[in-house]
Design a protein with these regions (language model features):
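Short acidic-glycine-tyrosine-enriched beta hairpin
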Residues: 67-81
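A hydrophobic/aromatic-rich effector-binding and dimerization subdomain
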Residues: 2-34, 82-155
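Basic/polar phosphate-binding segments, predominantly the helix-turn-helix DNA-binding elements
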Residues: 177-185, 203-254, 265, 269-300
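An amphipathic alpha-helical interaction segment
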Residues: 126-191, 196-199, 203
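Short, conserved beta-strand element in jelly-roll/cupin
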Residues: 46-63, 79
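Histidine-centered divalent metal-coordination motifs
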Residues: 46-48, 86, 281
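Conserved short histidine dyad/triad with adjacent acidic residue
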Residues: 30-48
Length: 301
């Protein structure tokens, strides 16, 4: 088993990540993310059923989720609970490295009607903190121990000595125990209101992903999310810190970057396919978000 170098995150129309982490028999993935290799320079909005810990190795990062932005420095760790919509990007574009550890919680907990799941997993997964941050220092309770366990997992995952599957499972269980003990100090557990916001957000994003190349109104988007225009805008601001229009623009630009890199379509065609009203409008928006024109972007690939 090898540590994988990732360079993109593939998602479906609901922003659920489509990649399988590890294997059916051993659902654990360990990735070294070097952001100089990433196609868009960052990890875009996504969610997954697995647990994730990101461990910052080099550079500084911003992790956005549910209305929060967490500034992460080398040696710091962030735990992201299952089902949480998040994205992460380096403060300095294209510079930074982190390890991502992603695993299926049922791999550790066993059956949902078993004692281990009910005692140590059910509350944390269903109503526990959406994220936790720890510093890998002796002064940070739990942080140093989690960092040591993650370092051991990287070595086991890449070198696979005898019994390494069992050793990794034991280390992940120790990490989970430490996270449970931190949980009492963690902010923002899941509430019915946040659960409702998350469902509306995913419905709206699903529609945007399926129709970003078309023109549609805010009213239509709100209908798809089963709410009103004003409430949808408040939901986006609470959860993502931006209005729906801004999220749609970012997504259109992301898709345009992919087409500019991976297709022979003209710039006018890329503009049309990604929902821009004209090539000039596309060019000005692309310059604002990416820092260069579409033509310059393609030339520098």
């Amino acid at each position: 088993m090898e540590q994988i170098k990732a360079n993109e995150t593939l998602v479906d129309s609901s922003l659920r990540e489509t990649k399988m982490h590890g294997t059916v028999d051993f659902p654990v993935g360990v990735y070294l993310d070097d952001f100089s290799d990433f196609k868009n320079g960052y990890i875009c909005w996504h969610w997954h059923e697995e647990i994730q810990i990101s461990w910052i190795i080099e550079g500084e990062f911003l992790c956005q989720m549910e209305g929060r932005t967490v500034h992460l420095h080398p040696g710091e760790l962030i735990f992201v609970n299952r089902g949480v919509l998040h994205q992460i990007y380096p403060v300095q574009k294209g510079y930074g490295k982190l390890y991502a550890f992603i695993w299926d919680p049922e791999f550790l907990s066993g059956s949902a009607d078993g004692a281990v799941y009910q005692e140590a997993f059910e509350a944390m997964l269903k109503s526990g903190p959406r994220c936790l941050t720890l510093a890998e220092t002796a002064q940070a309770p739990g942080g140093q121990a989690v960092g040591e366990a993650l370092r051991a997992i990287v070595a086991l995952y890449t070198q696979h000595p005898a019994l390494y599957h069992l050793q990794i499972k034991i280390l992940l269980s120790q990490i989970w125990l430490m996270l449970c003990r931190q949980e009492g100090e963690a902010p923002e557990p899941m509430t019915p209101e946040r659960e409702r916001d998350e469902e509306r957000l995913k419905r709206a994003m699903n529609y945007m992903h399926a129709h970003y190349g078309e023109h549609f109104s805010l009213e239509e988007l709100a209908r798809q999310a089963l709410t009103s225009r004003s409430e949808l805008c408040r939901c986006f601001r609470r959860m993502l810190g931006m209005p729906p229009k801004e999220f749609l623009m970012q997504y259109r630009i992301q898709q345009a970057e992919i087409l500019l890199k991976n297709s022979a379509y003209s710039i006018a065609e890329v503009a049309e396919f990604t929902g821009f009203s004209s090539p000039s409008h596309f060019g000005s928006c692309f310059l604002r978000y990416v820092g260069c024109t579409p033509r310059e972007y393609r030339k520098n690939l």
